[in-house]
Regions:
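Active-site loop/oxyanion-hole signature of alpha/beta-hydrolase fold enzymes
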Residues: 7, 35-39, 45-85, 89, ...
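Flexible "cap/lid" loop of the alpha/beta hydrolase fold
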Residues: 96-99, 106-138
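Conserved serine/cysteine hydrolase catalytic core
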Residues: 169-224, 229-232
Length: 261
């Protein structure tokens, strides 16, 4: 059984551990500042999803696979009860886990994603990534120039370029498993979370400038997460924690520290 790669902050702190999962083409490093800050209060596990970062590669990538990975991670680290936070694809993973294993989850935070099916919307990015020939490129700059032919937003190119690394045979490559992410894309993006209910305290956080969570999604959210609320973070798009970290961190801290009766 392979265990997800992680970086742990605040390991010596008491309190329920918070497990944090990034989005598609991301990695745990995207959440480094958040982990450091929250690790002052309770243990925080920043985790690479399968086929991302330094976690194992696999041909399988369903929501159930992602949920099982979280279960195995908990067992390996001897965690009994956890708080979960997931952004985008990571949000789908934590929703699926909470519905399958509700007894293991104290509180759930879902960042800028709903439990619904989404139409495919990363084709341009996947095409850009597949257009890079690592037999030919010799620098990060060359890779970024190729990506720029397909992707106009500099911030997206920089986000993707964080995944570049030098292999043992002195070639650049992606840390994520592009083959599986491309082949299984519809499995994890176009599929809704399996129907089920998680009754624990749940917070959905959306970016004011993002369209991933729409007002009409709130009915389905309440069906599956009856004890949930939706908070919108101003001056933030889909990458909420990066675009307005001050407000985002405050909202998360408040939610996790509340003791409701």
């Amino acid at each position: 059984m392979e265990i997800l790669h992680s970086k742990i902050y605040g390991e010596d702190k008491s309190g329920t551990p918070l497990l944090v999962f990034h989005g598609l083409f991301g990695m745990l490093d995207n959440w480094g500042s958040f982990g450091k800050e929250m690790g002052e209060f309770f243990p925080v596990h920043l985790i690479d999803l399968r086929n991302h970062g330094k976690s194992f590669h696999s041909p399988e990538m369903s929501h159930d696979d992602l949920a099982h990975d979280i279960l195995h991670y908990m067992e390996f680290h001897n965690l009994q009860k956890i708080n979960l936070l997931g952004h985008s694809l990571g949000g789908k993973a934590v929703m699926q886990f909470a519905i399958k294993y509700p007894i293991k989850v104290e509180k759930l935070i879902v960042v800028d994603i709903a439990p619904k099916a989404y139409p495919p919307h990363h084709q341009g990015i996947i095409k850009a990534l597949e257009s890079v020939d690592f037999e030919k490129v010799t620098s990060r700059q060359e890779v970024e120039e190729i990506l720029h032919q397909y992707i106009p937003e500099k911030s997206v190119i920089q986000f993707l370029a964080k995944n570049l690394y030098w292999t043992d045979d002195k070639k650049l490559n992606w840390r994520f498993n592009l083959k599986t992410l491309s082949e299984k894309y519809s499995q994890f993006v176009s599929n809704a979370i399996k129907f089920g209910v998680f009754s624990g305290e749940t917070l959905f956080v959306s970016g004011a400038k993002s369209n991933y969570i729409l007002p009409q999604d709130e009915f389905q959210i309440k069906q599956q997460f009856p004890n949930s609320s939706v908070v919108t973070i101003k001056n933030a798009g889909h990458w909420v924690q990066a675009e307005n970290p001050t407000d985002f961190n405050e909202v998360v801290k408040d939610f996790l520290s509340e003791h409701r009766v």
